């Protein structure tokens, strides 16, 4: 049986100790993401607490940190400065909307170019149509100098993940879960 999960108040967690323990158990590069509710994440604390998690992650020397492009400009600039030379930055946005068209996706990504080393965009997808828009955008960018990760959540969202090598995607997220339900959620597993 797995250990029982017992929720604790946020302020009772020593972030430095927790991050060191987390990193110590993983030999591969660590990507720290602390996604807010507004972008489909599960961090339920305040924005100030979330930024504190990102700061602590950078201070701990994680390999990568995921910084949403909608973080307040002054705060994002401070985090980018802290990360410089020790932690690489993924600039991300997670839209609750479906992708409008491939050209707009490409323009959005090009507009984010200076925001991080890898540009990650994620859209809600509902099938073939939206999956093809993401695929087309990734195809159009595959030979550019931009490092990208383009994906969807929902049916059709897994196409760019599955074809990551063909599309020259620089980062593909997968799960350790298995099951036929993953495809309808736009996810792939690691095996």
Predicted regions: what they are:
Residues 2-84, 88-101:
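Active-site beta->alpha loop and helix N-cap motifs at the rims of alpha/beta catalytic domains
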Residues 70-191:
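Catalytic alpha/beta core domains of metabolic enzymes, predominantly
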């Amino acid at each position: 049986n797995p250990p029982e999960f017992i929720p604790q108040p946020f302020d009772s967690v020593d972030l430095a100790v927790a991050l060191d323990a987390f990193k110590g158990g993983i030999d591969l590069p660590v990507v720290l993401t602390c996604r807010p509710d507004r972008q489909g994440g599960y961090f339920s604390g305040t924005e100030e607490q979330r930024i504190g998690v990102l700061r602590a992650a950078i201070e701990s020397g994680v390999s990568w940190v995921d910084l949403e492009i909608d973080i307040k400009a002054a705060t994002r600039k401070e985090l980018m400065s802290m990360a410089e030379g020790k932690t690489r930055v993924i600039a991300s946005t997670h839209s609750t909307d479906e992708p409008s068209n491939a050209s707009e996706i490409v323009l959005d990504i090009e507009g984010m170019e200076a925001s991080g080393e890898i540009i990650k965009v994620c859209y809600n997808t509902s099938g073939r149509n939206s999956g093809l828009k993401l695929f087309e955008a990734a195809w159009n960018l595959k030979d550019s100098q931009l490092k990208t990760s383009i994906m969807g959540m929902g049916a059709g969202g897994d196409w760019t993940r599955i074809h990551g090598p063909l599309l020259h995607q620089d980062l593909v997220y997968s799960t350790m879960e298995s099951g036929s339900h993953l495809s309808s959620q736009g996810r792939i597993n690691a095996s």
